[in-house]
From Swiss-Prot:
Keyword Chloroplast listed: no
Reactions performed catalytically: tRNA(Lys) + L-lysine + ATP = L-lysyl-tRNA(Lys) + AMP + diphosphate
Protein name as catalogued: Lysine--tRNA ligase
EC code(s) of this entry: 6.1.1.6
This protein's encoding gene: lysS
UniProt similarity note: Belongs to the class-II aminoacyl-tRNA synthetase family.
Binding site for Mg(2+) 1: E403, E410
InterPro entries: Aa-tRNA-synt_II, aa-tRNA-synth_II, aa-tRNA-synth_II/BPL/LPL, Lys-tRNA-ligase_II, Lys-tRNA-ligase_II_N, Lys-tRNA-synth_II_C, NA-bd_OB-fold, NA-bd_OB_tRNA
Subunit structure: Homodimer.
């Protein structure tokens, strides 16, 4: 009821303004920013501003109004900072002052022309000479700009969250800095940035369920990409030796604190290296990013001190299972009957055509992942679950593959690429023959096999989940907090 009443009065003010003024003007220009004002003049004393007339023109959203008779203090803010505005009858006419103060509400966007000064409490402020109402806010803002209390509203109305929540603003500014520094690092290391299709004729590069769309003119179904992997490797066949892509992937699967159907990844591929070299690149990349943002290699996340100093810990998937599963041995997890019983004891639903490798992965996900707090490369992934990775020379059941875990989250997946077209073809066909209920979207990619037949040089490639990395570097615990517009259930259901 209170909100309805306030909306009524705000609309009434707007209608009065329509009669006499050019409302929603677009001819106001800033000559600086609030951030630059603070940076350049914060340390100057009151006398400096008495002797130097600093004329500024700035704009922002009103977040507080204090009316004190013949003068008033406003506070305006933009995405970066805030500043106090002083307006009085002495600086503009009495009639204009009364009219302006009567018009204004918290949430309005105003332009201010004035001079800088410092108050008796040494607060850097703007003495207003002219004030322009640029946008009238008809709806009142929640909770006096102290932040939204309802997390669901934060996700559905991100604009309100950004206006009222400093942590959210900082999170998304930091996200931009992280991505910019990833790009700087890759370019510094002589990688070429490329773009590959977002719509695929068949889903490839992963086992996830795809989103399906339809091209009307061609009358064909297309799939939003699960991963760009197969296209990127075709570019290595074409002669590129160091490439990367930062873009969206789509997986038609469940929502969780670390899963969103639409997410951002950086994938990169390098010719003439193997997965050991690849791990060094990943270490250097993360070390570079953390140092650029925090000027140190250690950060706090969820009360853990995370150390990004090189080298990161390495452990095989098999050793990690034995370490975190009591009384489980290497021989146990190599025997199909015993490992099946172990999986069932952990309440894992086992499908009949799962082999030892798939069961190891399921047990690892259930019992080990959450314990990997410090940056850890888990290596020696089973061939059964790694159809695109090169098998080890001395053991064809495991591959030259790693996944990087930080704070219990997988943030990277890389391996030495399988470049034998015959072996790759056999792997694809074996996948098709043994696909489980959760793997019904596996297809045989003939074009990729054809490209391998022209010759893929020895190559290693890696994908890094940007959203999960941002979660860790901004101390957020849900992927929804680091994606501006996360996927949500229908609010009406």
């Amino acid at each position: 009821m209170k909100n309805k009443k306030e909306i009524y009065y705000r609309k009434k003010k707007l209608e009065e303004m329509r009669k006499n003024e050019n409302i929603f003007p677009n001819n106001f220009r800033q000559n600086t920013t609030i951030k630059n004002i603070k940076k350049n003049y914060k340390k100057n004393d009151k006398e400096y501003f008495k002797n130097n007339k600093i004329i500024i023109s700035i704009a922002g959203r009103i977040i507080s109004i204090r009316v004190m008779g013949k003068s008033s203090f406003l506070e305006i803010r933009n995405i970066e900072s805030k500043i106090q505005i002083y307006i009085s009858e002495n600086n503009i006419s009495k009639n204009k002052y009364k009219k302006i103060i009567k018009q204004l509400d918290i949430g309005d966007i105003i332009g201010v022309l004035g001079v800088l000064f410092k108050t008796n409490t040494e607060e850097l402020s703007v003495k207003c000479k002219k004030l322009y109402v640029l946008t009238k806010s008809v709806k009142p803002f929640p909770n006096k700009f102290q932040g939204l209390l309802n997390q669901e509203i934060c996700y559905r109305k991100r604009y309100l969250d950004l206006i009222t929540n400093k942590k959210s603003r900082n999170t998304f500014k930091t996200r931009s800095i992280i991505i910019n520094n990833i790009r700087k690092f890759m370019i510094k290391e002589n990688f070429v940035e490329v773009e590959t299709p977002m719509m695929h004729n068949i889903p490839g590069g992963g086992l996830s369920k795809p989103f399906i769309t339809h091209h009307s003119s061609l009358n064909i179904d297309l799939y939003l990409r699960i991963a760009p992997e197969l296209y990127l490797k075709q570019l290595i066949v074409g002669g590129f030796e160091k490439i990367f892509e930062i873009n969206r992937n789509f997986r038609n699967e469940g929502l969780s604190s670390n899963h969103n159907p639409e997410f951002t990844m950086m994938e990169f591929y390098v010719a003439y290296i193997d997965y050991e070299d690849l791990m060094k690149i990943v270490e250097n990349l993360l070390n570079y990013i953390v140092d650029k943002i925090f000027n140190k290699n250690k950060i706090n996340y969820n009360n853990f001190m995370i150390n990004f100093e090189k080298p990161f810990k390495k452990i095989s998937m098999q050793d990690s299972i034995c370490e975190y599963c009591k009384n489980v041995t290497q021989s146990d997890i190599s025997d199909i009957k015993i490992i099946t019983d172990i999986a069932k004891s952990f309440n894992i639903t086992v499908e009949k055509n799962w082999g030892v490798g798939k069961l190891q992965e399921k047990i690892f996900s259930e019992k080990v992942e959450k314990n990997l707090i410090q940056p850890t490369f888990v290596i020696d992934y089973p061939t059964e679950i790694s159809p695109l990775a090169r098998a080890k020379k001395n053991n064809k059941l495991i591959t030259d593959r790693f996944e990087l875990f930080v704070c219990g989250n997988e943030i990277g997946n890389g391996f030495s690429e399988l470049n034998d077209p015959k072996e790759q073809k056999n792997r694809f066909l074996e996948q098709l023959k043994n696909k489980t209920l959760e793997e019904q979207n596996i297809f045989y990619d003939k074009d990729y096999i054809t490209s391998l037949e022209y010759g893929l040089p020895p190559t290693a490639g890696c994908g890094i989940g940007i959203d999960r990395l941002v979660m860790i570097l901004t101390n957020n615990y849900s992927i929804k907090d680091v994606i501006l517009f996360p996927t949500l259930r229908n609010a009406n259901k």
